[in-house]
């Protein structure tokens, strides 16, 4: 699994475009999607120790992506 900074950099390179595109589709704003993508990878990095491998890594990352985007959309509602 992810055991070093190099491994995490590889993970980011592998998923950054897919995560950004998913965030952009959900948020509809380029700058918001870029900010969300950074936030998502910070959360992924912090939560990797909790990843149990019960789901595919990509599914886990996309779930974090959806949760971050939903949270951002809710915070913008009046």
Region locations from a protein language model:
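Arg/Lys-rich amphipathic alpha helix in sigma70-family domain 2
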Residues: 50-52, 66-78
């Amino acid at each position: 699994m992810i055991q070093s900074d190099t491994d995490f950099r590889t993970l980011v390179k592998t998923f950054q475009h897919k995560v950004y595109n998913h965030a952009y589709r959900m948020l509809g704003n380029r700058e918001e999607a870029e900010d969300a993508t950074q936030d998502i990878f910070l959360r992924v990095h912090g939560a990797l120790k909790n990843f149990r491998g019960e789901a595919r890594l990509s599914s886990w990352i996309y779930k974090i992506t959806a949760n971050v985007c939903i949270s951002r959309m809710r915070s913008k509602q009046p």
